[in-house]
Amino acid sequence: MTRIQNSHFRQEGTIMPVIFSEKKRHEISRQIKEAALRLFKTKGIRKTTVAELAESVGIAKGTFYNFYATKGQLVAEIMDDFDAASERELRNKIGGRDKIPIAEFYKYYVELFRPDTAFSFHFTPDDITVMQEMEETRKFFSQESTVYKGLHRVGI
């Protein structure tokens, strides 16, 4: 993993943020998400600090907030990514059909949550409770979730 240099420099006694290119912003954001998943898996969301996330990718704690307003916003973006990937995967599997047999959907759903590939496997049991409490992630436990919509669509 490439370490990112400190994103602040001193100019006339002040600390000024460095402006990142879109490409660099995307790369740093990806690194933050990867670090978050690693740390969440071992420590949980509640015990993972913004300082640890920033340090793990080589940025200042304050620079983290140039990417995410809160840790909850980071978790929500990770969940959005998973939700979008799940929807793409489901669309690929159903091949343009409007409906699929329940057995086929169930097979897909079981594959999606296999422990070796599952998004949920990156979180501790306490994390589900934490995510239900976070305003930024609450929607994933409601009817807005792609997985929830898919289950509802097939009558589950």
Regions found by a protein language model. Give the residues of each.
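Helix-turn-helix
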Residues: 31, 39-73, 77
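Alpha-helical DNA-contacting segments of helix-turn-helix folds
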Residues: 75-82, 89
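Short secondary-structure transition hinges
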Residues: 111-156
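Short C-terminal boundary/hinge segments that cap the last helix of small helical domains
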Residues: 44, 88-93, 122
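Hydrophobic alpha-helical connector segments
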Residues: 77, 91-118
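N-terminal intrinsically disordered/low-complexity leader segments
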Residues: 1-27
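A short, mixed-charge helix-start or loop-turn motif at secondary-structure junctions
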Residues: 17-19, 68, 133-134
